[in-house]
């Protein structure tokens, strides 16, 4: 979440006349994150989050907004999009598609314990099961086809060693097939900053704008790559097992998923290494932006590649 498009108090006050959520009291830009423009919005009725979408189009956005509304109706602790007076979730503000959603309580947990990882595992499994009946479909816009295109864009900026690592990983991933793995709706970005805790309990999960239909295990791998790492970019066995076991109790994992686990961990690291390389070397203009270190995910990828047999041992 960043601020690429400026919204003034007067502009938002006028825009909010299309909604029944009271008068604007306060507007505050959110600098964390990297994809969209986000503001905390306080009105006379409560607190909300305003998002102006910088990349996603009006044709793509109903999938994400309807998904949040669907999951909230099914008991998942996620933001609920607010409909305007015309009963639409999506509007336009300052030339960008825009929506406003409820603001969930809590803060992210930067130093998660095994207990936190277990809560996240259960949450993710419940989301996957609930999503099986979600009728809309969206391909993964950050999937293998995008990996190849993004790699071509960033390759001129890489050192010889970095380019070799990237090329080898693309070859490795292209040699593995995922068609037989369970699929459904995935969050695809369940990092620590997208899960909120309040007074030791989970407050909810946010930022569904990378959600798509893809391999469920890939979602679990992305989550493990952020929640379960130690300072050496290796999976911590205790936290990883807590995540996997809690997930498995709700959606039992298959033997074929165990076999694919090391591949999916590397795929998750590759995807975020590439997106961070893009953001670092090809930045977009913005007033409050947050660019993250791409080398972090290169280290994770290297660690996973060097420990494939060890990764397979950490399983339920």
Curated annotation (Swiss-Prot):
Presence of keyword Translocase: no
Pfam family, one: APH
Cross-referenced InterPro entries: Aminoglycoside_PTrfase, Homoserine_kinase_II, Kinase-like_dom_sf, Pseudomonas-type_ThrB
Coiled coil: none
Catalysed reactions, as listed in the record: L-homoserine + ATP = O-phospho-L-homoserine + ADP + H(+)
Keyword Manganese among record annotations: no
Known EC number: 2.7.1.39
Molecular function per GO: ATP binding; homoserine kinase activity
Sorted UniProt keywords: Amino-acid biosynthesis, ATP-binding, Kinase, Nucleotide-binding, Threonine biosynthesis, Transferase
GO annotation, biological process: threonine biosynthetic process
Pathway: Amino-acid biosynthesis; L-threonine biosynthesis; L-threonine from L-aspartate: step 4/5
Cross-referenced HAMAP family: Homoser_kinase_2
Family assignment from sequence similarity: Belongs to the pseudomonas-type ThrB family.
UniProt protein name: Homoserine kinase
Species per Swiss-Prot/TrEMBL record: Nitrosospira multiformis (strain ATCC 25196 / NCIMB 11849 / C 71)
């Amino acid at each position: 979440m960043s601020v690429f498009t400026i919204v003034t108090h007067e502009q938002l006050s006028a825009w909010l006349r299309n909604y029944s959520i009271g008068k604007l009291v306060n507007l505050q830009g959110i600098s964390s994150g990297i994809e969209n423009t986000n503001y905390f919005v306080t009105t006379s009725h409560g607190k909300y989050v305003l998002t102006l979408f910088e990349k996603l189009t009006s044709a793509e956005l109903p999938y994400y907004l309807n998904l949040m509304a669907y999951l909230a109706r099914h008991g998942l602790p996620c933001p609920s999009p607010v409909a305007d007076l015309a009963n639409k979730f999506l509007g336009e503000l300052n030339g960008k598609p825009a929506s406003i959603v409820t603001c969930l309580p809590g803060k992210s947990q930067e130093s998660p314990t095994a207990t936190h990882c277990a809560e996240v595992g259960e949450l993710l499994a419940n989301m996957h099961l609930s999503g099986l009946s979600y009728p809309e479909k969206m391909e993964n816009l950050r999937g293998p086809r995008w990996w190849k295109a993004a790699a071509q864009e960033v390759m001129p900026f890489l050192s010889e060693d970095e380019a070799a690592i990237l090329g080898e990983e693309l070859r490795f991933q292209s040699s593995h097939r995922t068609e037989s793995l369970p699929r459904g709706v995935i969050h695809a970005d369940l990092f620590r900053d997208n899960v909120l805790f309040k007074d030791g309990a989970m407050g909810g999960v946010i930022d569904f704008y990378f959600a798509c239909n893809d391999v469920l295990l890939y979602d679990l791998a992305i989550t493990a790559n952020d929640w379960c790492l130690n300072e050496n970019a290796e999976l911590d066995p205790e936290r990883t097992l807590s995540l996997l076991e809690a997930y498995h109790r709700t959606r039992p994992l298959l033997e074929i998923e165990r076999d694919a686990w090391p591949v999916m961990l590397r795929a998750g690291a590759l995807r975020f290494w590439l997106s961070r390389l893009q953001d670092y070397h090809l930045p977009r203009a913005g007033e409050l932006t947050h660019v993250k270190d791409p080398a972090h995910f290169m280290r994770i990828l290297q660690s996973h590649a060097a420990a494939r047999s060890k990764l397979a041992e950490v399983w339920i």
